[in-house]
Swiss-Prot record:
<comment type="similarity">
    <text>Belongs to the UPF0047 family.</text>
</comment>
<dbReference type="InterPro" id="IPR001602">
    <property type="entry name" value="UPF0047_YjbQ-like"/>
</dbReference>
<dbReference type="Pfam" id="PF01894">
    <property type="entry name" value="UPF0047"/>
</dbReference>
<dbReference type="InterPro" id="IPR035917">
    <property type="entry name" value="YjbQ-like_sf"/>
</dbReference>
<protein>
    <recommendedName>
        <fullName>UPF0047 protein MTH_771</fullName>
    </recommendedName>
</protein>
Amino acid sequence: MKCGVFMEVYTQELPLRTSRRVELIDITSMVSGVLESSGIRNGILNVFSRHSTSAIFINENESRLLSDIESMLEGTVPVDASYGHNAIDNNADSHLRAVLLGGSQTVPVINGSMDLGTWQSIFFAELDGPRNRRIRVSVAGKP
């Protein structure tokens, strides 16, 4: 794909209300809606969590796998370990889990669609809920 000098950039914030302390939410359709609204056909799309106790990741939307991911997070970063940050607001595990998963993902946009693999979905990981959250989706490219 050739891309000229001029690109369009479209940004939209998505509100999200979570209901559990740890919750993995498939946001693929929400993000796809932003892409459609952008009118951009070829370029890149970035999904960014505006919070330090949440994350964005890409993986398969299969219930047992999602349960395994939650178990992996608990095993790797237990809630009840002795963390220095807990002296401030008792959620260090949430911050550390967010570091492991990452705060954003970028996906190629080709012919108006996200170029995700067959089994890939975009997830918002709530790691310190329930809360009201905001996700920033930015699309850059050519219409």
